[in-house]
A protein has these predicted regions:
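Glycoside hydrolase catalytic-domain groove-lining segments
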Residues: 188-272, 323-327
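Surface-exposed, active-site-proximal loop segments in enzymatic domains
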Residues: 75-89, 113-133, 163-171, 268-278, ...
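Active-site neighborhood of glycoside hydrolase catalytic domains
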Residues: 139-140, 149, 156, 169-198, ...
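Substrate-binding cleft of secreted/luminal carbohydrate-active enzymes
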Residues: 155, 258-331
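Short, acidic/polar
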Residues: 48-64, 137-145, 199-208, 285-295
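Active-site groove signature of glycoside hydrolases
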Residues: 112-116, 140-172, 305
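Aromatic-lined substrate-binding rim segments of carbohydrate-active enzymes
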Residues: 55-65, 69-122, 171-196
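Boundary/entry segment of secreted carbohydrate-active catalytic domains
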Residues: 22-67, 73
Length: 332
């Protein structure tokens, strides 16, 4: 009996210590609203999939919303849709217009970049040996960096997008050695910081953060699970992200931490433009939008890139609902 009591004592001591450690590790700075900054991710592909004039949308983002931080993607399948035949016009134009608006640019390069299907490889690489694929990938990255590295508005290079998020997207298995080669290549070409990103809810962060000058996390609360065939609300509080940040800091030392993808659009079993408004509202209504902004402010981050600017514009121009566009405009 005494042994049982002793075991129970040890258990409670361990539990108290464990809970105390969680309390300590979930602490962190919560910045004042005036210290926060916001940007967006823009995808030409996403704008086109919504039936929008992507250039008109982009100009409105810069001139009407007055966004001063923007993440752009150098999609390999668009830049080099045919081997050695490069089409730079669209990316050049996006960078030029953002620079004219004096916006800071994060330029993402690699095979895996923002927006579905996650990986954006040109079709011509499908039937060539893996070693040659890797060589061609590095060549496209080198050409992209060299073409744009003299632009002072580019503040960082993002290498790949959520490379450690497995089982999501139509992507090959992660090759860590290749990822490290990509990062080393970009560092050899330019001294601006490297952004490496990871899933906020589904990944461990440490492998990505160890490779990053700037670590970027995603932040979602309402999604659709194909596995469960239902909508899912993550039962997490802002302290969850502070906890992960503090744990990750024990094993890595990025110079900067940002929320690179803050949910600000719906997520459903099919593309959201195919869903009725009532179903879109399940994962992103105006109230959820406001709540997400308030939630994110308490997570211990101070720089956020919202995910969904093309959707706000689509709601406004196609559906006559300008509320999201107007609400987002208050942040910039």
């Amino acid at each position: 009996m005494f042994k049982t009591i002793k075991k129970i004592k040890y258990f409670y001591v361990f539990l108290i210590i464990f809970l105390f450690l969680i309390f300590l590790l979930s602490r962190g700075c919560v910045y004042d609203k005036k210290d926060l900054s916001y940007g967006v991710t823009f995808s030409l592909k996403q704008a086109e999939s919504l039936g929008l004039d992507w250039q008109e949308t982009y100009i409105s983002i810069l001139n009407d919303l007055k966004v001063k931080k923007i993440r752009l993607a150098a999609y390999w399948d668009e830049i080099e849709s045919e081997k050695d035949n490069y089409g730079w016009d669209d990316l050049d134009w996006q960078i030029k217009k953002a620079s004219e608006a004096n916006a800071e640019i994060i330029l993402a390069v690699g095979g895996r970049l923002p927006r579905w299907p996650e990986c954006h490889f040109p079709k011509w690489i499908e039937n060539i040996p893996q070693a040659e694929k890797n060589k061609q990938l590095l060549e496209y990255i080198e050409l992209t960096i060299n073409r744009h590295k003299n632009n002072k508005n580019i503040v960082a290079w993002q290498v790949e997008n959520e490379p450690f998020l497995i089982n999501f997207g139509e992507c090959p298995k992660l090759d860590k050695g290749l990822l490290d080669m990509e990062i080393a290549l970009v560092k050899s070409l330019d001294n601006r910081p490297i952004v490496v990103t990871d899933s906020g809810e589904l990944s461990a962060w440490v492998p990505a953060a160890r490779r990053a000058d700037i670590f970027g996390t995603t932040m979602y609360r309402d999604t659709y699970s194909k596995l469960l065939r239902s909508y899912v609300h993550y039962p997490i509080e802002p302290g969850f992200f502070r906890f992960k940040k503090n744990i990750t800091r024990l094993f890595s030392s990025p110079e900067k931490w940002v929320v690179i993808e803050l949910q600000a659009e719906p997520w459903g079993p099919v593309p959201f433009q195919e869903l009725p408004k009532k179903e879109r509202d399940i994962t992103m209504s105006l109230d959820k939008f406001k709540d997400m902004i308030d939630f994110s402010r308490k997570t211990g981050f101070k720089e956020f890139y919202l995910w969904g600017v093309e959707w706000w514009y689509w709601e406004w121009k196609v559906n006559g609902d300008g509320r999201f566009w107007e609400e987002a405009g208050k942040l910039f």
